[in-house]
């Protein structure tokens, strides 16, 4: 059974991601380490004692569409009510609407634990938090006053409606339409697919944020508007009014996250009588909806990265517990009679340490991204720097962490051997749940394109160059520490950072020479190269914080393992970035 790693999470936040320094400088208001510890402890308790025990039944039963209504798995409605009672939905929401306005770092740490308990359940608050952010930033005063308080409390949930059958990654071709009405409202018509928690029985109302096109809108992405469309209309006194003209047509039958209802939503079908068209209100300006939605999408990408971290952590815990109990054969050098626990066999130990290193590296990257988001709002004159740092880290956090979630979950099955292939052990669920994360909220391939074409050029390339300089400083700090436990860590970090620096310089020059196809041929290898170097660097940073807690020896040992094993990939990845385009172009004849 999963147990929230509260101490490890707190350590990473404070001593690796930057929260401790931000608190000491007063950049996080009245927030102190004692309050941080208390919030993390209670979030961990909720994940361990309330969410995790219901994950299996959620996977087994799944969400069900019965007589036009979506029913959640047994126990999940009560679980959601407990969630509301705990006030968790409003951790980072504005205080004016009942939120706590706490740092984003705390929220993503809590999200990690809840996703480890059940990724399918945690998707509901994740989407609602994103909707709150979008309405807070772009909604009119009337929309905020009508909807935000109930969304912040969790009484009403939120969704994000982008995808259509023919419009996935390319939203410029979406066909959902909106028509103006004289009272300032709009009527929406169309179909949206893959809508997470689009319909369910846990909340009184569901607030859909829907992308649609006005009749006179420009073509492409410049003609997309964003609308708030509630399941139930809201009366002037705040009470619920009639059912809006929208419904869930069907639920998808998915590989994983079975407890999360993934809906096909129909708008404007006239199913409930009256005038056709789902009533909605404009969020932001007409034809500028994609910019409004991107705020929600960017933070959702980090939240999805946390899903990868969460699955990796839970899968690692399960595999390690099994490896300590399962006995097979005799490990080399084993003393005494009888079989050895498989954790003592070198190859099993290698797999488990790889799982641990990838998990902790992905956690540190994601928390560092959240720290940059917080500093972009709180750091005064340096806010622009932190805004760019958050932009640079977001695609890496999303892609590296979700790839790690899949890789670690797969290794977890391998550690279990044949039992891992049996559903009853629970190891397979982690892989089934993890597999969606590299796909949604922008595929990891799209994240790589974003990283290379939009994020490397920030400040003329100075942002990424400055970041690499910071990583070099970590390697120097390891070298000067003279701690034997680090082994060859400094040397391997130097080599990995040099590979990253060379690949970065080549990509920036290749883009400047207008050779976009060549640059994008190596975008995904570059993204992994960056993630691995960050993993080694952040694990080293944790190892250097030797006085922070009593686990310094363990942290240094894991750092050394990562540096001397995982970072061995960086040279090959650099070569794929710099030299892979020609062979890719030549081999495309095989795809014709």
Across the structure, where does each feature detected by a protein language model lie?
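Amphipathic, small/basic residue-rich leader segments at the start of a protein or domain
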Residues: 1-122, 146, 576, 582-592
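C-terminal amphipathic alpha-helical interaction region
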Residues: 458, 473-592
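A short core secondary-structure module
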Residues: 185, 189-243
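Acidic, low-complexity proline/glycine-rich segments
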Residues: 1-24, 274-287, 318, 324-325, ...
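Glycine-rich cofactor-pocket loops
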Residues: 27-30, 60-73, 286-303, 317-355, ...
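Internal maturation/activation junctions in enzymes
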Residues: 63, 76, 125-128, 139-176, ...
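Alpha-helix capping/hinge segments and adjacent helical runs
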Residues: 2-3, 180, 257, 368, ...
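A glycine-rich, basic-preceded beta-loop-alpha segment at the flavin cofactor/substrate interface
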Residues: 194-196, 233-249, 254, 264-300, ...
């Amino acid at each position: 059974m999963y147990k929230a790693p509260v101490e490890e999470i707190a350590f990473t936040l404070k001593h690796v991601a930057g929260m401790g320094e931000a608190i000491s400088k007063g950049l996080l208001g009245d927030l102190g380490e004692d309050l941080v510890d208390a919030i993390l402890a209670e979030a961990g308790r909720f994940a361990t004692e309330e969410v995790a025990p219901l994950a299996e039944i959620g996977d087994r039963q799944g969400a069900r569409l019965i007589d036009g209504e979506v029913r959640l798995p047994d126990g999940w409605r009560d679980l959601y009510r407990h969630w509301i009672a705990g006030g968790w939905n409003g951790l980072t929401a504005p205080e004016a609407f009942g939120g706590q306005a706490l740092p984003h770092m705390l929220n993503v740490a809590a999200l990690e634990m809840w996703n480890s308990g059940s990724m399918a359940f945690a998707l509901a608050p994740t989407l609602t938090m994103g909707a709150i952010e979008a309405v807070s930033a772009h909604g009119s005063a009337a929309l905020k006053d009508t909807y935000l308080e109930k969304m912040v409390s969790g009484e009403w949930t939120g969704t994000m409606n982008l995808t259509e059958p023919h419009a996935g990654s390319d939203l410029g071709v979406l066909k959902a339409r909106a028509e103006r009405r004289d009272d300032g409202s709009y009527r929406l018509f169309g179909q949206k697919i893959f809508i997470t928690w689009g319909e369910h029985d846990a909340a009184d109302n569901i607030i859909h944020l829907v992308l649609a096109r006005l009749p006179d809108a420009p073509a492409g992405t410049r003609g997309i508007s964003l609308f708030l469309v509630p399941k139930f209309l809201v009366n002037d006194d705040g009470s619920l009014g009639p059912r809006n003209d929208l419904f869930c047509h069907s639920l998808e039958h998915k590989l994983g996250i079975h407890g999360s209802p993934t809906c096909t939503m129909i708008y404007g079908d006239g199913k409930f009588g009256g005038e056709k068209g789902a009533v909605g209100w404009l969020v932001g300006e007409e034809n500028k909806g994609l910019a409004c939605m991107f705020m929600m999408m960017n933070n959702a990408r980090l939240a999805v990265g946390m899903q990868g971290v969460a699955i990796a952590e839970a899968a690692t815990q399960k595999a390690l517990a099994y490896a300590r109990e399962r006995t097979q054969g005799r490990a080399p050098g084993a003393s005494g009679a009888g079989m050895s626990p498989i954790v003592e066999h070198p190859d099993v130990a290698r797999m488990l340490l790889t799982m641990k290193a990838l998990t902790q590296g992905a956690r540190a990257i994601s928390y560092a991204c959240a720290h940059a988001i917080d500093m972009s709002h709180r750091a005064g004159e340096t806010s622009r720097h932190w805004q760019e740092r958050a932009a640079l880290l977001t695609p890496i956090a999303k892609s590296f962490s979700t790839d790690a979630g899949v890789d670690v979950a797969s290794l977890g099955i391998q550690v279990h051997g044949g039992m891992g292939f049996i559903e009853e052990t629970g190891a397979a669920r982690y892989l089934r749940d993890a597999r969606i994360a590299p796909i949604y909220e922008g595929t990891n391939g799209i994240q790589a394109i974003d990283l290379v074409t939009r994020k490397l050029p920030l400040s003329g390339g100075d942002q990424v160059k400055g970041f690499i300089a910071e990583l070099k400083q970590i390697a120097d700090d390891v070298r000067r520490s003279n701690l034997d436990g680090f082994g060859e860590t400094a040397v391997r970090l130097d080599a990995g950072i040099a590979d990253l620096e060379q690949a970065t310089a080549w990509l920036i020059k290749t883009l400047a020479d207008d050779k976009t196809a060549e640059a994008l041929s190596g975008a995904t290898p570059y993204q992994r190269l960056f993630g691995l170097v960050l993993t080694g660097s952040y694990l080293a940073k944790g190892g250097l914080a030797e006085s922070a807690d009593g686990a310094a020896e363990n942290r240094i040992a894991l750092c050394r393992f990562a540096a001397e094993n995982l970072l061995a990939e960086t040279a090959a990845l650099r070569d794929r970035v710099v030299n892979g385009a020609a062979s890719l172009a030549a081999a495309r004849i095989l795809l014709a």
